[in-house]
Regions:
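N-terminal secretory signal peptides that target proteins for export/translocation
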Residues: 1-9
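Membrane-embedded beta-strands of outer-membrane beta-barrel proteins
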Residues: 79, 117-119, 174-176, 217-219, ...
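Detector for outer-membrane/organellar transmembrane beta-barrel domains
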Residues: 161-253, 259-260
């Protein structure tokens, strides 16, 4: 456990050194990837896709994200790569690595990493038909594999031999995004969508007992001080209210998952294809009450810090 934490710390140091080195590269536009590797904010995708030519494959974008999950959810590290092609499609892969330096009763339910694959197709480009009001509209999916977290981990922990092993969770979504530029010196970014999902908190807490339609959205103000770009915004992501070992199983009694909120700042320096993200995520606190006198289950993840770095080659 200590050895894995040491490797993670070395990896973070190497990534920051790489980021500094990349700042000396050729100028280009930045590519902003979210927690799961999609073009987006922190926890929600935008309708935009990774940059690519209309008749070819674009250069890849890479990202690293870190979330201080607390004593229960543990620290999570995301390494992503995303590629755009045909001017309107993107696809990518993200690996989640977890550092379980804590040793509590519950944190071992959330100490396993997993894989995430995603794809997105832009159906309607922004400002189509030479208009100024048409949003970009896209459809996409997210597939998370090799998950052993939350309810599944609890069942495996209490039963020998493990009855399940791993599970998968998925999102299928429709999203619209518009950058409003009519307000002088203050562009506004608005994004909203709906998804069908069987995942709880992007798979961080595991699976939901059934598929549900959940809404999500983001809004941000774009500032351009001294040719730099600073985006300040907020996001909301509805969650399935319950969790289960696997989709189709009975819900674990007494659990209630709240809507996930995030407040983010994105800085894009002038002249380099790089951006930095800083966010505060309200994930979940007491999900099984009353969480007093040692009773209930408190995830202690109401105000968690996240950071991210994205770079496009």
């Amino acid at each position: 456990m200590a050895m894995r934490s040491a490797y993670v710390r070395r990896g973070i140091s190497a990534l920051f050194v790489l980021a500094i080195a990349l700042c000396t590269g050729n100028a280009a536009s930045a590519q902003s990837l979210d927690w799961e590797g999609q073009t987006g904010a922190l926890i929600t995708p935008f309708a935009y896709t990774a940059k690519s030519p209309a008749k070819g494959i674009g250069k890849p974008a890479v990202a690293f994200h870190y979330l201080s999950g607390g004593i229960i959810l543990n620290d999570a590290y995301q390494a992503s790569i995303t590629v755009g092609f045909l001017g309107r499609v993107e696809a990518g892969y993200t690996r989640t690595i977890v550092s379980d330096a804590n040793d509590t009763i519950y944190n071992h339910l959330f100490d396993e990493g997993f894989n995430t694959f995603h794809g997105k197709v832009n159906m309607i480009p922004e400002n189509m038909g030479k208009t100024t009001w048409v949003p970009a509209i896209s459809v996409g999916f997210v597939a998370r594999t090799n998950e052993k977290r939350g309810g599944l981990a609890l069942v495996n922990l209490l039963t020998v031999p493990n009855p399940y092993g791993t599970t998968e969770t998925y999102d299928f979504y429709l999203v619209g995004t518009k950058t409003i530029t009519q307000i002088k010196h203050l562009p506004i970014l608005l994004s909203a969508g709906v998804k069908g999902t069987n995942a709880s908190i992007l798979g961080i807490v595991g699976a939901a007992p059934d598929w549900e339609a959940r809404a999500f959205g983001a809004a941000g103000f774009v500032f351009t001080p001294g040719k730099q770009t600073l985006i300040l915004g907020a996001e909301a992501l509805q969650e399935p209210n319950q969790i289960a070992p696997k989709t189709g199983d009975a819900a674990i009694p007494g659990i209630s998952i709240p809507t996930t909120l995030a407040y983010f700042a994105r800085f894009v320096p002038s002249g380099v294809p790089l951006n930095f993200d800083l966010a505060v995520a309200q994930i979940a606190g007491c999900i099984e009450g009353p969480c007093t006198n040692g009773e209930g289950l408190n995830l202690h993840a109401r105000s968690r810090i996240g950071i991210g770095i994205s770079y496009r080659f």
